[in-house]
Amino acid sequence: MNIFNKNLHETDKEINEIIKHEKLRQSSVIELIASENFVSPAVLEAQGSLLTNKYAEGYPSKRFYNGCEEVDKAENLAIERVKKLFNCKYANVQPHSGSQANQAVYLALLQPGDTVLGMSLDSGGHLTHGAAPNMSGKWFNVVSYSVNKETYLIDYDEIERLADLHKPKLLIAGFSAYPRNIDFAKFREIVDKVGAYFMADIAHIAGLVATGEHQSPIPYAHAVTSTTHKTLRGPRGGLILSNDEEIGQKINSALFPGLQGGPLMHIIAAKAVAFLENLQPEYKSYIQQVISNAKALASSLQERGYDILTGGTDNHIVLVDLRKDGITGKFAANSLDRAGITCNKNAIPFDETSPFITSGIRLGTPACTTRGFKEKDFVLVGYMVADILDGLKNNEDNSDLEQKVLNEVTKLIKLFPFYG
């Protein structure tokens, strides 16, 4: 059988139809999932290239396979570009995901049973920062810090107290649902007092850090991890950065052969393309627009009477606290989805509701900003979200209002470009 003369439509009509329908879905909804974005056609082209055929265990010039001359060039380009982007001395672009980037740092710096101090999941932390169901929560002695019960801001005094008490081997800064800036310098002060390692997980705010719109952790953290999608607008994957090249060598060994085998060279090439795009002046303008749009979205919801956690946002995330409204996050997210607005249910700090139900929703602006939305558009989006939430407060059957908002979404989204 000659596989080289058949395209996807000819080979697998079912998958081809799924992709077509997913393209239609992505093009026709207002995407407010904070961890999602739209990559450029150039990134898609690299990711779908024949580099997927090449095995390349090891690192450039130190491979376990022959024939790696071209993929070595691609990986070196990705490394040099991302080092320039974040102004750092070391980068590893091989992690398959942000979770595996975090695991590689743990494997490099920790032993099973070591104490780790990270943000609790319900306060906005990530599964891989020590949550009980995750490997990090099973292998290490985890102590969690939370946000202030009144302001919902990071409580640096509590972190310092817990660090003094428990003497962690590793302190983690980072989040999956926290709308304010992080003081990485303060984290480093705490770390130095107790002799710990400091890891900053910037998966959500990497684009803000790269463009100077958020304090960089590079001068302070022993290791910095990130995803390469979200605000970096690249392929789904992971990344590890550092200014400590000795720690970098430990991380290299931890990732391969410790954690992964062959890297995904088509993904690494796509990362390189995204990093090149991120080095262009217009990328900084994009990130600034992401932040401005998030502020507009938060303000429009506040105007309609909804509680925005911490009273606003410094980044791309808007967390809506629905406790006083008597609506669950799951109920709200499902109704919004039917109205053509995708987001996710999200726990609120000190939330007593099940994590499968939650008391809030998380909204984000990166994806629609990529499509060209400005502040005025996000004000309209905020009003649409509020309309749906208002309807849920009055009537569990929100179908008529969902259809009305869906019509408004369809009218608005057609004004903005998508893949041809």
Curated annotation (Swiss-Prot):
GO molecular function, one term: glycine hydroxymethyltransferase activity
GO CC list: cytosol
PROSITE patterns cross-referenced by the UniProt entry: SHMT (PS00096)
Residues flagged as site, Plays an important role in substrate specificity: 229
Biological process annotations from GO: glycine biosynthetic process from serine; tetrahydrofolate interconversion
Residues reported in the UniProt entry to bind (6S)-5,6,7,8-tetrahydrofolate: 121, 125-127, 246, 354-356
Record-linked SUPFAM superfamilies: PLP-dependent transferases
Pfam families in UniProt: SHMT
Needed cofactors: pyridoxal 5'-phosphate
Intracellular or extracellular location(s): Cytoplasm
Modified residues (N6-(pyridoxal phosphate)lysine): 230
Class of this enzyme: transferase
Catalyses which reaction(s): (6R)-5,10-methylene-5,6,7,8-tetrahydrofolate + glycine + H2O = (6S)-5,6,7,8-tetrahydrofolate + L-serine
Keyword flag Amino-acid biosynthesis: yes
Recorded metabolic or biological pathway in which this protein acts: One-carbon metabolism; tetrahydrofolate interconversion; Amino-acid biosynthesis; glycine biosynthesis; glycine from L-serine: step 1/1
Keyword list, A-Z: Amino-acid biosynthesis, Cytoplasm, One-carbon metabolism, Pyridoxal phosphate, Transferase
Assigned EC number: 2.1.2.1
Subunit structure: Homodimer.
The family this protein is said to belong to: Belongs to the SHMT family.
Function: Catalyzes the reversible interconversion of serine and glycine with tetrahydrofolate (THF) serving as the one-carbon carrier. This reaction serves as the major source of one-carbon groups required for the biosynthesis of purines, thymidylate, methionine, and other important biomolecules. Also exhibits THF-independent aldolase activity toward beta-hydroxyamino acids, producing glycine and aldehydes, via a retro-aldol mechanism.
Name of the protein this chain belongs to: Serine hydroxymethyltransferase
Source organism per UniProt: Rickettsia massiliae (strain Mtu5)
